[in-house]
Amino acid sequence: MRRLALLLAGVAGVAVAAAPGTAEARAKVHVMVVGKSAVLAGPERVALKARTARVGGKRCSIGRATPLSVLAGTGVSFSLKDYGACSSRARDAGSLYVRRIGPDRESGTDGWVYKVGRRAGSGGAADPAGSFGTGRKLRRDQHVLWFWCVKDAADSCQRTLEVKPARERAEPGAALQVTVRGYDDSGDGVRVEGALVRLGDAAALTGADGAATLTAPAAGSYRLQAEKPGMVVSFPVRVAVG
C-alpha cells in the first residue's frame, strides 16, 4: 500500500539502547497514535532514542530519530513485517513495515501511515534516508502522527485536522475564536466546516470559514482539540484561562 507505514514491532518487546549524553540525545518530539475509532497513544513527548525490536526470531536496530523509533517509544503494542534484511545495524531497517498497532491491523488498501508535521512520509518509518528521502531525520519538538488511513479512490488518506486559537490565553467567560484546517497527504490545507472544537466543557462547531467561537471556561489550563467524522482528530493545543 502506497506510503503505508514501514516499520517493525514484533511482540511488545522494545529495548532502548544507550543514548549519548548530549543535548541532541535528550531531544523529544510530540507523538500521537490515532486508530480506527480511538486514540491509542499520546499525545505525549517521546525521546529521540535508538531502539531495538524483535522481528520474527531476530532483534533489529531502529535509528533514533525515526517515526518507527518514536512509535515504539510510546509503549503501544504493534507488529511489523520485514521486507528487507533488518539487523543490528540501524541502516538495514529501511524496509520494516507496520502491519498492526493496537487492535487495528492492515486490511486491503487501508492501514497505518505516519505524518511528520502536516505531510505524510514518503519513506519507510525507519529509513535511514529520512521520512522524505532527504537525509533529514526527526528534530526536537516536531509533531509525529501515526493514524489509521482509509484510502479513497485517488489513493489518498483522509485529512488530518489542525486547530489554531486566536490566542493561547484568555479570561474566564471571554470569547475565543479558533480556526480548524484539514491537511491532505501533501500537507495542503483547507478550512473545515462542521468540525467540533472543545475547550474544557465549552464546545462549538466550525462554520463554512472553518472558524468557531468558544466561551472560555473557568480558570485553568485546558486542551483545545478538534474532531470531525471521516477526518483525523487534531493534536491538542494548550490554552491557559485566567
Segments the model singles out, each with a brief description of its role:
Residues 21-242:
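Ubiquitin-like/PB1-type beta-grasp interaction modules and other compact soluble beta-rich domains
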Residues 1-24:
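Secretory targeting and sorting signals
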